[in-house]
């Protein structure tokens, strides 16, 4: 099974630990992570316009992202065979 979280910072945040860089948008990030975890397919994520779902390119080819706010995004990969996200990370996208 692929690792769930790509970086330690995101894993700590999800486990309830305070992550200084994420405090300004913590509530929004938790909400988006809940939506991501509950999605039965990536098409379900596309159906919510507020997610601003997109397939990424360049050095992030094969990854997808949903929006937390104008600066931060949740990037992840999706397994088609079992329909779940993995290598999830919260990134400063700009």
Stretches found by the model and what they are:
Residues 36:
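Conserved phosphate-interacting/catalytic interface
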Residues 22, 41, 48, 87-88:
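Short linear functional motifs in flexible/disordered or boundary regions
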Residues 16, 39-42:
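Short hydrophobic alpha-helical module
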Residues 57, 64-94:
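Enriched for short, Lys/Arg-rich terminal
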Residues 1-33:
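Arg/Lys-rich, positively charged N-terminal/basic patches that mediate binding to nucleic acids
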Residues 2-4, 12, 43, 61-68, ...:
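Alpha-helical interaction segments
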Residues 41-64:
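A short, surface-exposed loop/turn module that caps and links secondary-structure elements
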């Amino acid at each position: 099974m692929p690792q769930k979280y790509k970086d330690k910072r995101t894993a700590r945040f999800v486990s309830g630990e305070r992550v200084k860089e994420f405090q300004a948008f913590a509530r929004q990030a938790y909400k988006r992570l809940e939506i991501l975890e509950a999605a039965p397919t990536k098409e379900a994520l596309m159906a919510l316009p507020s997610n601003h779902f997109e397939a990424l390119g360049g050095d992030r080819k094969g990854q997808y992202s949903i929006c937390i706010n104008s600066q931060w995004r949740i990037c992840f990969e999706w397994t088609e065979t079992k329909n779940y996200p993995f290598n999830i990370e919260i990134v400063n996208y700009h």
